[in-house]
A protein has these predicted regions:
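C-terminal and inter-domain tail/linker signature
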Residues: 1-143
């Protein structure tokens, strides 16, 4: 089951996050899934997740999510990933900068059967904000 769960996470990254098939999110997540560390403004359950993914996709329409490493134990899968793309639309209140990003992150997904029932994600948000020019690089003062 661990290998199957790892494959499901990889399929989700390819089909939904990189491919943009947001409607397919329900193929991978339970309707009442729980986001343990919700994205700012994220509503509950599957619908809240889909709304968040739409916002991410509109800010970064050329998003590419790559699995770097996965570890599975029991009903959990930990995935280390890289997210890249260019900031072409509003994201978290930040107007498009047209700058590229490359952000690392990790997510722990818990499965019940074929679907993810809880997830928690940690990304290098600080690094992303520096890449977008919102936070100045070390040694430079904010304007």
């Amino acid at each position: 089951m661990s290998d199957r769960n790892k494959a499901r996470v990889g399929e989700f990254l390819d089909r939904v996050l990189t491919g943009g098939d947001i409607e397919a999110t329900g193929d991978y997540f339970a309707h009442d899934m729980v986001e343990e560390m919700p994205f700012p403004g994220q509503g509950p359950g599957l619908e809240g997740l889909k709304e968040t993914l739409i916002r991410i996709r509109s800010g970064f329409p050329d998003s590419n999510w790559t699995v770097e490493e996965q570890v599975a134990e029991g009903d959990k899968v930990m995935t280390r990933f890289v997210w890249s793309g260019s900031h072409q639309g509003e994201f978290l209140g930040i107007p498009a900068t047209h700058r590229p990003i490359r952000v690392w992150g990790m997510v722990i997904d818990r499965f019940a059967g074929e679907k993810i029932v809880s997830t928690r994600i940690l990304m290098d948000t600080f690094g992303m904000m520096m890449q977008l020019g919102v936070i100045p690089p070390a040694g430079q003062q904010a304007r």
